[in-house]
Amino acid sequence: MAGAASPCANGCGPGAPSDAEVLHLCRSLEVGTVMTLFYSKKSQRPERKTFQVKLETRQITWSRGADKIEGAIDIREIKEIRPGKTSRDFDRYQEDPAFRPDQSHCFVILYGMEFRLKTLSLQATSEDEVNMWIKGLTWLMEDTLQAPTPLQIERWLRKQFYSVDRNREDRISAKDLKNMLSQVNYRVPNMRFLRERLTDLEQRSGDITYGQFAQLYRSLMYSAQKTMDLPFLEASTLRAGERPELCRVSLPEFQQFLLDYQGELWAVDRLQVQEFMLSFLRDPLREIEEPYFFLDEFVTFLFSKENSVWNSQLDAVCPDTMNNPLSHYWISSSHNTYLTGDQFSSESSLEAYARCLRMGCRCIELDCWDGPDGMPVIYHGHTLTTKIKFSDVLHTIKEHAFVASEYPVILSIEDHCSIAQQRNMAQYFKKVLGDTLLTKPVEISADGLPSPNQLKRKILIKHKKLAEGSAYEEVPTSMMYSENDISNSIKNGILYLEDPVNHEWYPHYFVLTSSKIYYSEETSSDQGNEDEEEPKEVSSSTELHSNEKWFHGKLGAGRDGRHIAERLLTEYCIETGAPDGSFLVRESETFVGDYTLSFWRNGKVQHCRIHSRQDAGTPKFFLTDNLVFDSLYDLITHYQQVPLRCNEFEMRLSEPVPQTNAHESKEWYHASLTRAQAEHMLMRVPRDGAFLVRKRNEPNSYAISFRAEGKIKHCRVQQEGQTVMLGNSEFDSLVDLISYYEKHPLYRKMKLRYPINEEALEKIGTAEPDYGALYEGRNPGFYVEANPMPTFKCAVKALFDYKAQREDELTFIKSAIIQNVEKQEGGWWRGDYGGKKQLWFPSNYVEEMVNPVALEPEREHLDENSPLGDLLRGVLDVPACQIAIRPEGKNNRLFVFSISMASVAHWSLDVAADSQEELQDWVKKIREVAQTADARLTEGKIMERRKKIALELSELVVYCRPVPFDEEKIGTERACYRDMSSFPETKAEKYVNKAKGKKFLQYNRLQLSRIYPKGQRLDSSNYDPLPMWICGSQLVALNFQTPDKPMQMNQALFMTGRHCGYVLQPSTMRDEAFDPFDKSSLRGLEPCAISIEVLGARHLPKNGRGIVCPFVEIEVAGAEYDSTKQKTEFVVDNGLNPVWPAKPFHFQISNPEFAFLRFVVYEEDMFSDQNFLAQATFPVKGLKTGYRAVPLKNNYSEDLELASLLIKIDIFPAKENGDLSPFSGTSLRERGSDASGQLFHGRAREGSFESRYQQPFEDFRISQEHLADHFDSRERRAPRRTRVNGDNRL
């Protein structure tokens, strides 16, 4: 979520430092200083450490001593540097007299790649030292980001190498190299693969130096991608073979490439091209009159940010476009700005305001409630979210409001305060914000809103306003009362439900409304205290070694143990290339109570006895009498850091050799169990996360059988030498694999939780197997001769939006729950949704929900509009509930009450609280609601409709005056430009559609509208903003803390103008004839066609343990009639430098002024699910053509280091000679759409789906082929300098 904010909060001096000063600063930071680090964890006290800047890698590092680096941050990730004690890390020690540093001696570094930034809070020894660090780091931040790509690669290579070569010996082992390449997403099949390539580099044995590593990297990158169809590559490769350094791209050749292929008009000037090449290479030895690229450097340029598909000229703010009324702009807007996570238990933070403002957000929300001492607090009312002071928020806004943008900021006030506290709010607005607060109109006689230029550096208040002449009065609110809004709940919080399998209690979020109790799926109980550190249980020191991978126990009797140890070490070190010092520890066969250390040195196994003795009843361990340890674990840890010394050698213990058969004693392992037997066992445990591991018949092969989403699934595990493989993830052992997936999801959200064996089945297994977990409704007969089982009726969840094409179909949105589903053949099912019963919908748009366990009587009738939204697990009707406190508690929980229902016999739900007070309050409120449900609902509606407003606060409202939306006023004299309306997304959807979209756009041409997420989005997810934008809504408020597609689209919309927060809507939208949903209403706008080939990628991020198998989805998002997506094939096991086969993708865009081109890189996992890796989204109007790099971002829209796609992109006008060609993109796509529609609508209610619809499918395929041929022919005819929006200057 990169913005354009200055890194230093309060400025960084009068000007840029001179070259001499920069040199002095860099030398000083490289030497480092001793400073005190204040931690974010309460359990850690401040410590003095040495802080240094590593210029070779552009990192800040810290350590206690000179040897071991304890931590590091990349300078490229630093977002802001603040002088003073401006973080909560200092606040934790205010009461400790030992840690009260001088304000002028402190500074804070904020860094990270997510919305919520991390802090490095430091105390220096003097104010001069603080200034040195701030000034030096500020220069380094800018210089690091602006460095040319080859220099960034050099720094990245050194960072990777030094992460292994921590002692800076300039050498690493082949095993280290193999592991390093795996970490950067490159599959090394075996050690021989590396040896062959290292031989090419004249490295025949021993360790690898940095120079050899760097050369290997360049060789791997070029050899993998030289097959791409690129200019110069084919002919040059024939001449140079595998040696790219034997062939060059000269200055004239590069100039011609820029002109002919890239359409770069600036390249007509050879001097500019020369300067560009020199600045890219930045090599003193290459500063010659005619610079050149080696072939691998040319390919590197194609993937570089310097060759971006985005036209960087659009990054600059154009003041001439800032003179329209505010209502003509899209304005970057945040919802519940103060939150850092979900809507019910996350932290409210001042940093969230600072982050949003520095990202260019221009409309932020303040949710104000009565607080102590007469001053409001800000939080999400009636939830567990933490509270922050209103006055602190104002100071934060003042400090950060105009750092990223000088254009106006709108404060959207959600006011729940009393009159007295409203008056205090008004006073503080004026006191803190001063002259920046707008208190009077810019022009008294204006007939429209002022422009961004007229409101520069002004802050506007959005709040309800009194009628003229009132001191205070009750005014109607524009919000309809809804008991499904969590802010209107009577009580909510964390309670606990017992797991029926392991009888542990897990937290769930409960909400009590005026008529129902809602509760969520399992959640975290401490989201609001993310800085708290859970104390770890420490085993007895004498047993610490038992779980270490290097401890092998008793390997055999007599000399067998010695021989087994030698075999294990020899096989492991030869196969993996493990270094000297690789070791294992085993019980001694000769001396009871002693152990043997076996290690690898110079190609042989050596053994050393570890002695033990009792000292005052406590065991002690030692190799030599003069150095004794309290435990075997301490001894081994010591010699991993300090060398073993003897007359012949000195050597540290390096790599532990893992146990090979440790899994055989585990409760989840079954040596002789068939697939059918495993399934039968799991059918008796109807809980997700139940699992077992079984040996398969194939050599070195295992299977994990588990339950997820109500179904039994299997995945194969393969032993390959010393490595255990699950998909493309590598583990040292089967035990390590299971341990990893007990902490991380194995399949979607499912973690391995309940190990299953016969003993476990006796305790928790059901008497009757759950056959529904194994057999789908489409194949109900699990015995061939049995009568068919009745069709299952289940619930499904929508994966995508779907709009009905016929009267007998359902319309639903993504995540909708469709009930009472009947699975039919032919790809179409029936179900109930939105009040419609048993209508058709496509089965591939949904996924089946987990079979509901018989805990919740209303689970099959879940309320789709509940306050918990997608987090909902169950709902209870309060008037039907009976509450009973269990004085004795239950299963180690003291504070338990039961909920039962008279209508459901023999059913109750046991719920636990954290305290007696909490239990009593819940029981009291539930009983009250049960008695007064109807009256409370009526009272709530009445109270919410009337609100008192203080005059002092009302007077601060000038332009943003919220009023109830009145459709009848649109286009009449009663419409006032100062009035605006707010809509939850559900209400907005009633206007942003074909029926009313044009009318709503007319409203937005004069007045502001604000749209915000519905209250049920407790997970802080976002809605699709595109329909709101195209209908003219200016303030489309999103949860900035959530890294989802809507926020990525938001970042793309506002990327022009340096994220200034204001984007002028296209002039088309101000045309009275324009209809957002009718492409025939477009006037004066030329449609375009885009052809894209995805050629390759570099430096894709990892997702978990394995090497990724990436594919790319290309999407055009914009007007409803333009939106479409296509995808490439996936590449197996390569995220470092994958290449895709040549395949053009074609897109037709009718409204390019409101269109985005979006690339998303996914990986396909072993379950054929797609997992997000990276994305890049651009407005179509700013795209360049030719062979272009697509710099990739993470899900928070932060730049990924060196990650990019290489594409070939051409953009054509869709019309030729003024008329549409019979084989133009438009006509072919419409013909294809017709054929697709026939295929889609003509589904079989009976009979064969395949036979009846073969012909429409064939017509669709032929149309698509014609479209591809059309693009190819146009590409051959079109000049190479095709461009969009003028000059494609870099």
UniProtKB/Swiss-Prot annotation:
InterPro entries registered for this protein in UniProt: C2_dom, C2_domain_sf, EF-hand-dom_pair, EF_Hand_1_Ca_BS, EF_hand_dom, PH-like_dom_sf, PH_domain, PI-PLC_fam
Start and end residues of each SH3 domain: 791-851
Region called Disordered, residue ranges: 522-544, 1271-1290
Effect of residue 1021 to F: In IDAA; likely pathogenic; gain of function; increased phospholipase C activity
SH2 domain ranges (all copies): 550-657, 668-756
Source organism superkingdom: Eukaryota
Residues carrying Phosphotyrosine: 506, 771, 775, 783, 977, 1253
Recorded GO CC terms: cell projection; COP9 signalosome; cytoplasm; cytosol; lamellipodium; plasma membrane; ruffle; ruffle membrane
Domain PI-PLC Y-box: 953-1070
SUPFAM superfamilies, sorted: C2 domain (Calcium/lipid-binding domain, CaLB), EF-hand, PH domain-like, PLC-like phosphodiesterases, SH2 domain, SH3-domain
Any one biological process term the GO annotation gives: release of sequestered calcium ion into cytosol
Catalyzed reactions: a 1,2-diacyl-sn-glycero-3-phospho-(1D-myo-inositol-4,5-bisphosphate) + H2O = 1D-myo-inositol 1,4,5-trisphosphate + a 1,2-diacyl-sn-glycerol + H(+); a 1,2-diacyl-sn-glycero-3-phospho-(1D-myo-inositol) + H2O = 1D-myo-inositol 1-phosphate + a 1,2-diacyl-sn-glycerol + H(+)
Residue positions, PTM Phosphoserine: 1221, 1227, 1233, 1248, 1263
Domain EF-hand: 152-187
Residues binding Ca(2+), per UniProt: 165, 167, 169, 171, 176
PTM (free text): Tyrosine phosphorylated in response to signaling via activated FLT3, KIT and PDGFRA. Tyrosine phosphorylated by activated FGFR1, FGFR2, FGFR3 and FGFR4. Tyrosine phosphorylated by activated FLT1 and KDR. Tyrosine phosphorylated by activated PDGFRB. The receptor-mediated activation of PLCG1 involves its phosphorylation by tyrosine kinases, in response to ligation of a variety of growth factor receptors and immune system receptors. For instance, SYK phosphorylates and activates PLCG1 in response to ligation of the B-cell receptor. May be dephosphorylated by PTPRJ.
Enzyme Commission identifier(s): 3.1.4.11
N-acetylalanine: residues carrying this PTM: 2
Regulation affecting activity: Activated by phosphorylation on tyrosine residues.
Domain PH per the UniProt entry, residue ranges: 27-142, 489-523, 895-931
SMART domains the record matches: C2, PH, PLCXc, PLCYc, SH2, SH3
Function: Mediates the production of the second messenger molecules diacylglycerol (DAG) and inositol 1,4,5-trisphosphate (IP3). Plays an important role in the regulation of intracellular signaling cascades. Becomes activated in response to ligand-mediated activation of receptor-type tyrosine kinases, such as PDGFRA, PDGFRB, EGFR, FGFR1, FGFR2, FGFR3 and FGFR4. Plays a role in actin reorganization and cell migration.
Disease: Immune dysregulation, autoimmunity, and autoinflammation: An autosomal dominant disorder characterized by anemia and thrombocytopenia associated with circulating autoantibodies, positive Coombs test, immune dysregulation, and increased levels of proinflammatory cytokines.
Family annotation (PANTHER family): 1-PHOSPHATIDYLINOSITOL 4,5-BISPHOSPHATE PHOSPHODIESTERASE GAMMA-1, PHOSPHOINOSITIDE-SPECIFIC PHOSPHOLIPASE C FAMILY PROTEIN
Name used for this protein in its record: 1-phosphatidylinositol 4,5-bisphosphate phosphodiesterase gamma-1
Lineage, opening ranks: Eukaryota, Metazoa, Chordata, Craniata, Vertebrata
